[in-house]
Curated annotation (Swiss-Prot):
<keyword id="KW-0694">RNA-binding</keyword>
<keyword id="KW-0699">rRNA-binding</keyword>
<dbReference type="GO" id="GO:0003735">
    <property type="term" value="F:structural constituent of ribosome"/>
</dbReference>
<dbReference type="InterPro" id="IPR022863">
    <property type="entry name" value="Ribosomal_uS12_arc"/>
</dbReference>
<dbReference type="InterPro" id="IPR012340">
    <property type="entry name" value="NA-bd_OB-fold"/>
</dbReference>
<dbReference type="GO" id="GO:0006412">
    <property type="term" value="P:translation"/>
</dbReference>
<dbReference type="InterPro" id="IPR005679">
    <property type="entry name" value="Ribosomal_uS12_bac"/>
</dbReference>
<keyword id="KW-0687">Ribonucleoprotein</keyword>
<comment type="subunit">
    <text>Part of the 30S ribosomal subunit.</text>
</comment>
<comment type="similarity">
    <text>Belongs to the universal ribosomal protein uS12 family.</text>
</comment>
<dbReference type="Pfam" id="PF00164">
    <property type="entry name" value="Ribosom_S12_S23"/>
</dbReference>
<comment type="function">
    <text>With S4 and S5 plays an important role in translational accuracy. Located at the interface of the 30S and 50S subunits.</text>
</comment>
<dbReference type="InterPro" id="IPR005680">
    <property type="entry name" value="Ribosomal_uS12_euk/arc"/>
</dbReference>
<keyword id="KW-0689">Ribosomal protein</keyword>
<dbReference type="GO" id="GO:0019843">
    <property type="term" value="F:rRNA binding"/>
</dbReference>
<dbReference type="InterPro" id="IPR006032">
    <property type="entry name" value="Ribosomal_uS12"/>
</dbReference>
<dbReference type="GO" id="GO:0015935">
    <property type="term" value="C:small ribosomal subunit"/>
</dbReference>
């Protein structure tokens, strides 16, 4: 009779636990997390927010069945020079952002750190313009400072 693959016994717990760990590498999410693959590919390098300079304003067409041009900006990050597209949330928000402004961007909050809703390929949103919160500019509480 051939031997058993698993150890059985009162003191076999450590061996059993180590054995189970091997199978976790078959799980794609576990593998990505352990090898830090998403962090390596992330333009923000794992940080929650990043500063950047606005290069240009761009209009991104919404995916079907919606029909709109979502107002976005191309931003060059200060810390590594990478370029990303960031969404400008709010009615008329794009009017408060000019080229060469310094903006702070953060993740847009889509599933698995990806794009949200009908805006294809846009993973970030603008939070601040020239060190003033975009939401405050939209409410009219603060005027945008000149840099």
């Amino acid at each position: 009779m051939p031997g058993k693959k698993s150890p059985a016994g009162e003191f076999a717990a450590r061996k059993l636990r180590e054995k189970r760990k091997k199978f976790r590498w078959k799980d794609e999410r576990y593998k990505r997390r352990m090898l830090k693959l998403d962090e390596k590919a992330d333009p923000l390098e794992g940080a929650p927010q990043a500063r950047g300079i606005v290069l240009e304003k761009v209009g991104v067409e919404a995916k079907q069945p919606n029909s709109a041009i979502r107002k976005c900006v191309r931003v060059q990050l200060i810390k590594n020079g990478k370029q990303v597209t960031a969404f400008c949330p709010g009615d008329g928000a794009i009017d408060y952002i000019d080229e060469h402004d310094e903006v702070v961007i953060e993740g847009i909050g889509g599933p698995k750190g990806r794009a949200k809703g009908d805006i294809p390929g846009v993973r970030y949103k603008v939070v601040k313009v020239n060190d003033v919160a975009l939401s405050e500019l939209l409410k009219g509480k603060i005027e945008k400072p000149m840099r």
